[in-house]
């Protein structure tokens, strides 16, 4: 970001979080696979963020670059949740018979010591995006439902 800011005054820096889409590895696909293979999962309940559907991100970036309102924008799914909430919704929508149990980051780290450290709060506010293009990102649950309706379960 600093390089871009130093290089030009005409830039769009777009920040997102908890991104998932139809291609590649992501949390949704991981949970679906684990939910198929296991009866129970322990998922962190003390880290909050905004699940973001890649299609929504792409759509809003396209709208944004049609303006000349350069700057830094947050572009994430509307609303926030924990990884536990996200995983629970994935299991519900996928029809998996897997119980999702909440745990703390500390408990998770003791079970999986090689897991990556994550921030406790990575939620972003899309205010500048709303003010610039007059449009809001979809609620994370609505976007996830559409995603789940279009993937093989």
Task: Give the label of every model feature segment.
Residues 82-84, 88, 107-152:
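Conserved C-terminal active-site "lid" loop/helix of NAD(P)H-dependent oxidoreductases
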Residues 1, 27-28, 54, 58, ...:
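A general structural signal for well-ordered alpha-helical segments in protein cores
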Residues 55-63, 141, 145:
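Amphipathic alpha-helical segments that line or abut small-molecule/effector binding pockets
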Residues 60, 67-115:
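Mid/C-terminal beta-alpha module of Rossmann-like enzyme folds, strongest
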Residues 2-49, 56:
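NAD(P)-dependent short-chain dehydrogenase/reductase
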């Amino acid at each position: 970001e600093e390089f871009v800011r130093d290089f030009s005054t005409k830039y769009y820096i777009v920040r997102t979080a908890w991104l998932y889409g139809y291609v590649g590895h992501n949390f949704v696909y991981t949970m679906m696979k684990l939910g198929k293979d296991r009866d129970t999962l322990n998922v962190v309940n003390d880290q909050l963020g905004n699940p973001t559907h890649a299609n929504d991100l792409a759509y809003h970036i396209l709208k944004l670059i049609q303006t000349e309102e350069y700057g830094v924008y947050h572009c994430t799914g509307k609303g926030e949740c924990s990884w536990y909430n996200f995983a629970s919704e994935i299991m519900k929508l996928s029809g998996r018979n897997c119980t999702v149990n909440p745990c703390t980051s500390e408990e998770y780290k003791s079970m999986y010591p090689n897991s990556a450290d994550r921030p406790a709060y990575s939620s972003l506010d899309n205010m500048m995006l709303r003010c610039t293009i007059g449009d809001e990102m979809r609620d994370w649950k609505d976007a996830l439902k559409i995603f789940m309706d279009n993937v093989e379960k």
